[in-house]
Amino acid sequence: DTLMAARNPEVVAMERQLQAESAILIKNDDNLLPLSKGIKVYIGSTASAMTLEAYKKVLPDFATVVSDMEDADVVIADCTQMNDAAELIIEDAKDAGKKLVIVANHIDPNTYMVANADALLALTFSRPADHGTGASGFITTTEPIVFAQLLFGDAEPAGMVVKELARDEAMDDAQWKDLAGDQGANQYVRMMLLAMMKTSENHTVPGNWGDPLIQYQYGMKYGAQPDFVYDTLVLPRATHEVVTESNGSTSTSYESIVETKAGVPFTAYVLLWNNGDDGMTTVQAVCDGEVIAEKIMAVNGGDWRVVEMELTIDQPGEHTLAVGTLTKTITIVE
């Protein structure tokens, strides 16, 4: 506070605006954010004790801060790194059945955060300490007051993902580092993207040909809703020879049916359109009423993505398989 009072008010205001506008809303189930003022919150953080105390100093202007997670309406997990301490906060909140807001504070969101958070906010702002000092006592990321304003709606996140995010480290390692848009893509798609880049230096590479966790330019807004539509479910097929006898002659034809082998993994594909604003959903594959696989999909507004799911059905026979809102009958053979 003393430092802020000594600085030019216009610079402070501009910097705080930048902090808010560079924040990215990744997930917001049931419009949990912004939080309602006056609720009871528990905050856990992997930041320094000084930073955590700074948060606890400003949060009472917006909510009641409780020291026992069991007493909270909402748990806030401020993650400056993804370590055992961060996972402990998250797992404790889930075990307690609490609504959970995860703040990815100057770190990339990952699949674990997305899967466990009810709401996920990424804070990307960072600056050197005044005069370049490395002395303790300086918060060089998003200020506590802006942190609280973002959570409770006095400021709104307006940022977007500037580089697509991988689903896991193995996917990120497999990415061609000089190629955009290829997280999770197969080699054929990578060659297509490379050819497009070489055709024109200014060519815009598609951001939905791969299988990233989060697409380039993704960023949700408070109150804005996605509108997901499922289209064109593709399942494995088998071709069978059909021999027909008629009037003493034999004819051969072929029929293709949705079929695969028991216990052998197969891939289901579906197009997922988003006719609304940027948003996220969990696509479920359901066999005979039982969920057999799930996949998190974030889709930019007005865009589409191909959902690719590896499935296995062990029991031979005919089964009803649904992916999202689309359903087909699939035959499983020995």
Task: State where each predicted segment sits.
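Preference for extracellular/luminal or secreted protein segments
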Residues: 1-317, 324-334
